[in-house]
Amino acid sequence: MAGKGEGPAIGIDLGTTYSRVGVWQHDRVEIIANDQGNRTTPSYVAFTDSERLIGDAAKNQVAMNPINTVFDAKRLIGRRFSDASVQADMKHRPFKVVSGPGEKPMIGVNYKGEEKQFAAEEISSMVLTKMKEIAEAYLGSTVKNAVVTVPAYFNDSQRQATKDAGVISGLNVMRIINEPTAAAIAYGLDKKATSVGEKNVLIFDLGGGTFDVSLLTIEEGIFEVKATAGDTHLGGEDFDNRMVNHSLQEFKRKNKKDIMETPGHIRRLRTACERAKRTLSSTAQTTIEIDSLYEGVDFYSPITRARFEELNIDLFRKCMEPVEKCLRDAKMDKSTVHDVVLVGGSTRIPKVQQLLQDFFNGKELCKSINPDEAVAYGAAVQAAILSGEGNEKVQDLLLLDVTPLSLGLETAGGVMTVLIPRNTTIPTKKEQVFSTYSDNQPGVLIQVYEGERTRTRDNNLLGKFELSGIPPGPRGVPQINVCFDIDANGILNVSAEDKTTGQKNKIRITNDKGRLSKEEIEKMVQEAEKYKSEDEEHKKKVESKNALENYAYNMRNIVKDEKIGAKLSEADKKKIEEAIDASIQWLDGNQLAEADEFDDKMKELESICNPIIAKMYQGAGGDMGGGMEDEGPTSGGGAGPKIEECRLSCHFF
């Protein structure tokens, strides 16, 4: 339950390319717009010589600052640096990714003239902080509690890393829920009035960087996931990459120039390709057009929808494999699926829709929910349920999700012994008794794996721990009880107990592949606070600078005004003009001064200008400026209402 004074609980869809935030208010979900008026916020973080930018501001300057603008952190989170997908992505990324402690991918940027390294969790935490601030600005109160979504096919380490990102951002992550399950909630509430009896629903969720398929049965508010499948490295970004590679070859063919892969050129090309891809969802042909792409040469290349489909057809077909796997795992025939629901921006691609419709023998696809907002919508509903804020319409909803991958441990000969098969409903707890492999064995090494292969070397090692102090005895005699316990977030705890001695040991899977320690998380929390206060200082500095600039130029306009200028003595006029010129000159040479320096200059200028302007108003007997007689300036308050209004307006520059 959310504590008092913590504000409403929010739902955050932390996407690869875009993120969204929703809240349950007035018996409905509100997807909240950011300060630019957009309901989607780019999952981008940029670092410059003077500040850190997050969201739209970061994405808008990416072409000018590609090597210090970070995106796609979700494709790095919870992975090893040596993972094939991490290595493959590096050629498409302008920013630097290096191997950190425990093979953790670290992102290298230049921030305020210094080389810095950030973990993917830290970048994701910055995006989460931005989403939290968007919600706080809308709600007018602080927000502490959130439900955050992850792809259904995220493994244990990716889920735990996402939870860590929430902690670093200062959020209490009440629950990690699967994106297709969240979308199913949006679908279920949309259909609640008209739905009767049990329905089998397939959620097809193809986003910017990840792909999930989940099959659920929905009946009277109970959402039971039967099976899930997917690919945590397939989405719109991959379709963009194909277009970028195609365009590079086109440019080389037409101009006999090989674009040196300088980040700025590639970034401009990628932005144009992404725009073309979106256009091709609604038209049959478009043009990729970039002025002066490389060495002054313009790039102009028409592209048809058919060509785009040809470039990506293998990836589009690959999207159908998890659909088949999901139906197989759920032991369900495709004819028994009542609705196929499209979620994620990439489901707008006509060829993807056509392949899916053909697979389901021409069945009409369900497009009644917003594919971009459905996940955040479901997360906001779940947040309301967990914090006790929702009405009776949502409080009786029950989510029964599953674990996407089989979990087990290594037994003699490197065999994977499964304790929890994939698609087991969570939370769940399974126990099994094991024994020793050799005589007088003093301890056992328990190695925990996830995956579907029979040999552990082909699966993913999550973590390991030792149970020592086993009394000497023949092989097969000691009894070691191993317990696997998965919580509602899909995060695994493993414990082992020697039944003879009562000796116990346990592990919350903090795998060996770069999971953050408690100390590292604490350090990152402190750094996040530091960056936040630096951002606030920068904002204050800009506001103080703008205030001084506006005041100086406004005073100059007032003095130059013939009606007002005529009322000033030559000495006063000269005094004000000299003070204004000195301030403007100081501003030009001190753009990087601190906020208090701008404030001091402001006070200095006001102390010269205000008394003269006040004297002029009094001398005019209040007959100036149309009814401003009671609004005379006071020291430190600006010269009359016109100036005060202008000082306020500086916030909009």
UniProtKB/Swiss-Prot annotation:
Induction: SCE70 expression is neither significantly influenced by light nor heat shock. Keywords: ATP-binding, Chloroplast, Membrane, Nucleotide-binding, Plastid, Stress response. Transmembrane segments: none annotated. Pfam families: HSP70 (PF00012). Belongs to the heat shock protein 70 family. It comes from Spinacia oleracea. The keyword ATP-binding applies. Sce70 may play a role in the transport of polypeptides across the envelope membrane and into the chloroplast. This is Chloroplast envelope membrane 70 kDa heat shock-related protein. One of its GO terms (cellular component) is chloroplast membrane. It is found in: Plastid, Chloroplast membrane. CDD domains: ASKHA_NBD_HSP70_HSPA1. The keyword ATP-binding applies. There exists a 70 kDa heat-inducible gene (HSE70) in spinach leaves with sequence homology to SCE70. Its main location: plastid. GO terms for biological process: chaperone cofactor-dependent protein refolding; protein refolding. One of its GO terms (molecular function) is ATP-dependent protein folding chaperone.
